[in-house]
Amino acid sequence: MRLVSTDGKKMSIIICRLVVSARRFEWFNVSKELSIYRHLDGKIIILDFFTYCCINCMHILPDLDVLEKQFSVADGLIVIGVHSAKFANERDSKSLLSAIQRYNITHPVVNDPALTTWRDLGISCWPTLAMIGPTGEVLAVFVGEGHRDELVLFVNVALKYFKSLNKISERDNVPLQLARHLLPVTEDDSLLFPSKLEIYLNEQREMLIVADTGNNRIFIMDTNGDVDHVVGGPNPGFNDGDFHNAKFNAPQGVCILGDSVYVADNENHSIRKIDLRKKMVTTVVGTGVQGHDYVGGKNGTDQALSSPWDVAIYKHEHCENGMVPVLLIAIAGTHQIWALFLKDTTWWKNREYKAGTCVAIVGSGREENRNNAYPHAAGLAQPSGLIVVQEKKMLFFADSESSAVRSVDLRSGRVSVVCGANRDPTDLHDYGDCDGVRHAAKLQHPLGIAWHLEEQLLYVADTYNHKIKKVDVTTGYCKTVYGDGKPKETFSLNEPSGIAISPNKGLVYVADTNNHSVKVIDTRREVITTLQMNIPRIDVSDGTNNVYTFDTSISEKGGELTILLKIIFLEHDLKLNSNAPQRWSVNQSSGGNAGWVATSTGGPLSNPLVINVLEGIGIHEVPLILDIIACKATECLPKKCSVVYRVHQKADASSVLTEEREIVVK
């Protein structure tokens, strides 16, 4: 922060120039451009010089929100965002509109693509806040993030002082019209700014995890779009709990280990774990508020983080325990890569870490494009996408602000360039859109990265070029393959930020962020389609408390499936009332057309459900409702649970099957 003593008349001219020249540009969040005489005269003005790619610019948005809630326009304060783009793509007003919507910016914003006001005021870095007095004088300039307390103090003092001089206007006629009203209407099965994807295999199906960032939730579905679980959403929050009550805030990267999905809960500055078996969400790292630690070493929720953007699992060779899992975390806020040790681990240079310890392992914390054999001497620039290639013992990452793909040797910690960026480690402005080798290749703020197992190549979401590119990690050759009308006109993307590749089908799944969709690219047929999601419509108007989905397989020739259901309560003082009816019922009306018939439409929970599956192929859904009475010492509670049993008919499956499934009830 610095105080400014300057010619008030000159500054007033500069502010007038901002407003007058801005008529040639575009305003956002207002119905018409602001006038210095009708709207800004007699106000304390905070000019926020930002570029929407910048993590530090994102970090001050909560500070501005606090400021605007404490001091209204009628009180004499108005905040104006002056978008001063770093990247070429950011100069486009459509791209800026999406960013304003994505980050829920609610104050007026003007797009200054030529950086006219930036130069007039001598601004030198993002973000910078200029505090302007009611007659055009610059009162203070705050450079960088972390000035919330000073901002509140200065605005409070300035308002009191200028009110005593009768120079503050209480007029509140700013024509606000928020950009969010232009967003598509979000339905239960639609996405809003999806960011990251992960593919995994369970016993029966190829599964897809989607971070529906704008709706603050996670979808667990198969790669055909059939949704098993919706976790969190739609409003932001920071709550652990079951899938319905848990809350995220702009979740980004996802990865899976066993039955656990790890989530980079970006704006909660934490790592969350989704337990698919227990159907519960817990916080494993982070305090819920932004940290400023560049070292780490604390355990779990005692360790503060700063804007985790992606996560990946590495199976580290441990001399005593064999392979131990380590969760790698792209910490965009401090320009580092951290590790959460899920078990006791001997790490690089024989450092010992206890299970639950979270520590910085790569990056000095300086925003640079500096490669180095020593991991803590390397400089990263907002790492935003991670992929572990286990057989190579390598981590590859999309280093967004250096516009590069880089690597970490997970045996030693050496950081190297794969492609993109400049040879000068301090030059973070060498971006473009060019195929080539190593530094000759140019990218523009890449965010997503995946490994194509069959091709042995990286696929990169080159976000601000709206393209997907292939990278040979041995030669460093980078080539555009999809997007911006290539290979066909139908291949059009808008800031893709996540990518995942099916190891079985060879399909590429892309989080097409600003198009609010997941695109599926068939690389063999060169066809691109939009993934249609299907959420089973469960009628919960009758008080259904929980929804459960299970999968099983039976022969294409048909057969008999016997299902036994066992109730388990998370609350230890809950138990089934032995004197009350505990029943299941099945919707028989959907069975005949679906290729199955139940031998009974209902019965006590102690009796199995028997399904006769007819000869055929495909997937059949058997819907069940469980009506149970659970009791504590002093009260009994009725509960309804909805179960969707998916029966897959396969050639190599058994024709007679008995299964016992656990229903975990909160």
Where in the sequence are the language-model features?
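Short, internal strand/loop/helix patches
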Residues: 97-126, 130-132
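Gly/Pro-rich loop segments of beta-rich domains
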Residues: 169-195, 225-250, 280-310, 347-382, ...
